[in-house]
A protein has these predicted regions:
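Individual alpha-helical transmembrane segments in multi-pass integral membrane proteins
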Residues: 8-22, 41-104, 108-118, 149-153, ...
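Membrane-helix boundary/juxtamembrane motif in polytopic membrane proteins
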Residues: 40-41, 103-113, 140-148, 164-189
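Juxtamembrane "helix-exit" motif on the non-cytosolic side of transmembrane helices
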Residues: 60-69, 125-137, 195-205
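N-terminal signal-anchor/start-transfer transmembrane helix
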Residues: 18-32
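Extracellular-loop-to-transmembrane junctions of the mid-late helices
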Residues: 3-20, 120-165, 210-212
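Short, hydrophobic transmembrane alpha-helix segments
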Residues: 4, 28-38
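Aromatic-anchored segments of alpha-helical transmembrane domains
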Residues: 51-56, 115-127, 188-196
Length: 235
């Protein structure tokens, strides 16, 4: 019975909120690029694009796992997780672009950071026996759990918060400070979301998975909107 509830909960989390979030993020991308397709708006749009692609991959993976499980599920989950984690590098690059301006933070430097970030997460995702798929869902091993937490902390949490706070100190206008505060709160919620997701795929406690399964919806929508209304809307 618990397994059945968990399965239907997963389907609810996938079809209703995640499809809605893909539509919402697509709308935000459209608004940013229609207003001004400059370097900063393109960079931040990439964050929403890769998150949306990760969500779509996850939808497909859960559909196949539920109706026709097979070895291909692992590949879909691989891309879903990788695309989602890879998206956060564009937030870091976006902040650095605002902080150092395009004349100092060149496209070449941005590309190097994006490439290094992608390689680091690709190596982690290829970790031997790091992820297994009992009962048609991904389960992280303890070594993988530790490595993922360390990598996310080093690659996003520390630089994301540090450079955001540095950027806030540079702003003198109170309205800009308020908007950047919303942006920072959005980043903080995204950080909580990712750490929770890593734990969600590691700790197989039904109560935690049910509660956090619903929390994911609130955290992802809130973080996405706060990041947009904080800095993305006025690019």
């Amino acid at each position: 019975m618990i397994f059945q509830i968990d399965e239907y909960l997963r389907l609810f989390i996938i079809f209703v909120p995640q499809i809605f979030m893909v539509g919402l993020f697509s709308f935000l991308i459209f608004k940013m690029l229609r207003r001004n397709a400059n370097r900063n708006s393109l960079t931040l749009s990439c964050f929403y694009i890769f998150v949306s692609l990760g969500l779509l991959m996850n939808v497909i993976a859960v559909l196949i796992a539920f109706f026709s499980p097979g070895e291909f599920i692992g590949t879909l989950y691989f891309f879903a997780t990788f695309l989602t984690m890879f998206s956060f590098v564009f937030v870091v690059v976006f902040i650095l672009s605002l902080l150092k301006l395009k004349y100092e933070f060149t496209l070449k430097k941005a590309f190097v950071i994006i490439l290094a970030y992608g390689i680091a997460w690709l190596i982690l995702h290829l970790y031997p026996s790091g992820v297994t798929y009992p009962e048609r869902v991904p389960v992280y091993s303890i070594p993988y759990f530790i490595a993922a937490n360390i990598l996310f902390t080093v690659s996003f949490t520390i630089p994301g918060i540090y450079y955001s706070l540095r950027l806030r100190r540079l702003f003198k206008d109170s309205d800009l400070k308020r908007k950047l505060s919303l942006f920072i709160i959005g980043i903080a919620l995204a950080i909580v979301l990712v750490y929770g997701l890593i734990l969600y795929n590691t700790w197989q406690d039904p109560t935690f998975k049910t509660i956090y399964g619903f929390s994911i919806i609130v955290l992802l929508i809130s973080s996405g909107l706060l990041i947009y209304y904080g800095m993305g809307r006025d690019l």
